[in-house]
Design a protein with these regions (language model features):
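Intrinsic-disorder-associated, low-complexity terminal segments enriched in Asp/Asn/His/Tyr and depleted
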Residues: 10-13, 17
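Short, contiguous pre-domain boundary segments
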Residues: 24, 28-50, 69-70
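Catalytic cores of DNA base-excision repair glycosylases
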Residues: 32, 53-55, 59-60, 64-249, ...
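Active-site segment of metal-dependent pyrophosphate-handling enzymes
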Residues: 181, 279-283, 288, 330-368
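N-terminal strand-loop-strand
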Residues: 254, 264-309, 338-341, 363-364
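The catalytic Nudix box helix
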Residues: 310-344
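NUDIX/MutT-family hydrolases
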Residues: 361-412
Length: 419
């Protein structure tokens, strides 16, 4: 029998990484580590064009990284498994949150065999709260593939890495260079920003010509035999110094930076077209029957495939949220329900959507004959359960539904307020 997942609030940080990450200076909304001062950070009148001084630029960057690298747990040994997990976790996730999840993950799945032997339910539960759950399912599929086709040894060849589920060009480059020190340039948003400023890339970085130029420059500035340090240094510099609010006085590349020399740092990178934000009104309901509540397991397709949830869906034009939750329950389960109380609104977002989740307490509409509820007719799920509220913690749920589930057992009772 596998050990049960640790309860919320009992998570461990065995090596104190989270505490180390929190030992920082705070600037505005950003938390930044204390950086080693850089001499000559403000460029002298004689700007040193980066194309003509690549060895100096490389040395300055590596020296800065050696002095300022954050104590991240996957940097202790650079094992392929740990590098891979960290790279997947940090997609769409802030660093401090990623470190916390990484440490918990390693307690539960310390190596490839442990992950490959896990069930999808266990993996999704460990991933809960990070979102984009296809990443977790791909991790499990890739781990099993490595065990079956590579004898349990994570491949070092970039083509073999790229063939694993859920691994794209960036993650391939990151694993190849950071885990195996292969001469492959990593390009993420941080690297794009650094290169766009140092080399004055004057068009949106995601456009074809700019992307090609950045890729070519990233390869050119990669020092021989130092891919691991260099790629991490570029990403670290973009995260800590060359951010949206640049700290040019702390930058080791200031004397090489063309945008700084021209006084246009805040104009680089050139912004692309912003994605439009779409608001969505969604409903869900907690259907109670005596001391148990109804949950269902989503179909395997989609962003939250395979997760447990309270049934619900979008509010259609002309509907009130109360009408929508009654309709959704009828469509998804066959149950006829009525709203007994509002539980509040949970606000959250994903990709370009901003969601308001209206939550309601529900009861079955039946005659007065006491009997168990009829079995549901599921149209949007593969399974369902009637559970005591305390049992909900064992299920993997989307973040908003987890917030609702946790509120049901909170000392103050259900939400009864808007988040």
């Amino acid at each position: 029998m596998r050990p049960s997942p640790p309860r919320r609030g009992d998570r461990k940080d065995p090596r104190g990484y989270t505490a180390a990450m929190r030992s920082r200076q705070t600037t505005g909304q950003h938390t930044l580590p204390s950086l080693v001062p850089v001499t000559g950070a403000v460029p002298p009148p004689g700007h040193r064009p980066p194309e003509d001084h690549l060895p100096e630029l490389q040395q300055a960057l590596l020296a800065w990284f050696d002095a300022n690298a954050r104590p991240l747990p996957w940097r202790r040994h650079y094992t392929p498994y740990e590098v891979w997990i960290s790279e997947i976790m940090l997609q769409q996730t802030q660093m401090e949150r990623g470190v916390s999840y990484f440490l918990r993950w390693m307690e539960r799945f310390p190596d490839l065999p442990a992950l490959a032997a896990a069930s999808e339910e266990e993996v999704l539960h460990a991933w809960e709260g990070l979102g984009y759950y296809s990443r977790a399912r791909n991790l499990l599929a890739a781990a099993r593939l490595v065990m079956q086709e590579h004898g349990g040894v994570f491949p070092s060849d970039p083509e073999a890495i790229r063939a694993l589920p859920g691994i794209g060009p960036y993650t391939t480059a990151a694993i190849a260079s950071i885990a195996f020190n292969l001469p492959v340039a990593c390009i993420d948003a941080n690297v794009e920003r650094v290169i766009a400023r140092v080399f004055d890339v004057d068009s949106p970085v995601k456009s074809g010509p700019a992307a090609a130029r950045i890729a070519e420059l990233a390869r050119r500035i990669l020092p021989e035999g130092e891919a691991r340090r260099h790629n991490q240094a570029m990403m670290e510099l973009g995260a800590l110094v060359c951010g949206k609010k640049p700290r040019c006085g702390q930058c080791p590349l200031a004397r090489f930076c063309t945008a700084l020399h021209l006084g246009i740092v805040h104009e680089r990178p050139v912004p692309g077209k912003k994605a439009e934000i779409t608001p969505i009104e969604v409903v869900t309901g907690v259907l109670s029957n005596h001391d148990r509540v109804f949950v269902q397991k989503r179909l395997p397709q989609g962003a939250w495939g395979g997760l447990w949830e309270f049934p619900g869906g979008r509010v259609e034009p002309g509907e009130t949220p109360e009408q929508a939750v009654v309709r959704e329950f009828a469509e998804e389960t066959g149950f006829t329900v009525r709203v007994t109380a509002p539980l509040g609104i949970i606000r959250h977002g994903y990709t370009t959507y901003r969601v308001r989740l209206h939550c309601f307490a529900l009861e079955l509409v039946t005659d007065d004959t006491p009997r168990p509820p009829e079995p549901p007719v599921l149209t949007a799920a593969t399974a369902c359960r009637w559970l005591e509220r305390g049992e909900l913690e064992s299920l993997a749920m989307p973040a908003a539904h987890r917030k609702l589930a946790d509120s049901l057992t909170a000392p103050k009772g259900p939400l009864l307020t808007a988040f």
